[in-house]
From Swiss-Prot:
Origin superkingdom: Bacteria
A single GO molecular function term of this UniProt record: structural constituent of ribosome
GO biological process: ribosomal small subunit biogenesis; translation
UniProt keyword Protease, yes or no: no
Taxonomic lineage of the native organism: Bacteria, Bacillati, Bacillota, Bacilli, Lactobacillales
CDD domains registered for this protein in UniProt: S4
SMART domains (UniProt xref): Ribosomal_S4, S4
Purpose of the protein: One of the primary rRNA binding proteins, it binds directly to 16S rRNA where it nucleates assembly of the body of the 30S subunit.
UniProtKB keywords: Ribonucleoprotein, Ribosomal protein, RNA-binding, rRNA-binding
Protein name as annotated: Small ribosomal subunit protein uS4
Domain S4 RNA-binding per the UniProt entry, residue ranges: 93-153
Annotated spans, Disordered: 21-43
Tagged with keyword Nuclease: no
Any one cellular-component term (Gene Ontology): small ribosomal subunit
């Protein structure tokens, strides 16, 4: 299954979650797309509820189903912690997500493009793989020739706050993961146990 590249607002409204992180998609029309979206009151089955939760997380991180499931299987091999929490930590450690968390991009989709186009380095080496798994202490920074990009400057200036598990130097446009996040620091509205149930059904 390929990665969805269409309008994110349609998926946001269908799943009831802001994929952009701004919430703008849901402010004006907090219901599913379509002429009768506002009047729908669809009752989901147990499977439907699990599927929707899985899709929320997958689309939030902008991954294909294969990428998502492979990472889920990897999380299941980690001995400490719960499967769901370990899965979410692995998702957070993706390079494109860390670029977003550091505030170098306003959305994960924008962050993924910055990585794909070679604007990001890890420990001084250019890395153009969005799924690259960031380790604690590795320095993520903007390439020297890319530091004047308006899209990056605008993103940094727009940041309101950053997660406590990252540190960032605005002058150097560089930051790092200082520790693994706790489950309560991640999406509190998402029930990761439903995703575990979905794949283990």
């Amino acid at each position: 299954m390929s990665r969805y590249t269409g309008p994110s607002w349609r998926i946001s409204r269908r799943l009831g979650v802001s994929l952009s992180g701004t919430g703008k998609e849901l402010n004006r029309r907090p219901y599913a797309p379509g002429d009768h979206g506002q009047g729908r009151r669809q009752k989901l089955s147990e499977y439907g509820t699990q599927l929707r939760e899985k899709q929320k997380l997958r689309f939030t991180y902008g991954m294909t189903e294969r990428q998502f499931y492979n990472l889920f299987k990897r999380a299941g091999k980690i001995k400490e912690g719960t499967h769901g929490t370990n899965f979410m930590i692995l998702l957070e450690r993706r390079l494109d997500n860390m670029v977003y968390r550091l505030g170098l991009a306003t959305t994960r989709r924008q962050a993924r493009q910055l990585v794909n186009h070679g604007h990001i380095t890890v420990d001084g080496q250019r890395v153009d793989i969005p799924s690259y798994e960031v380790k604690i202490g590795q320095v993520i920074s903007v390439r020297e020739k890319s530091k004047d990009m308006a899209i990056i400057k605008g993103a940094v200036e727009a940041v309101v706050g950053r997660p406590q598990y990252v540190e960032f130097d605005a002058d150097k446009l560089a930051g790092s993961l200082t520790r693994f996040p706790q489950r309560e620091e991640l999406d509190a509205e998402l029930d990761d146990s439903l995703i575990v149930e979905y794949y283990n059904r």
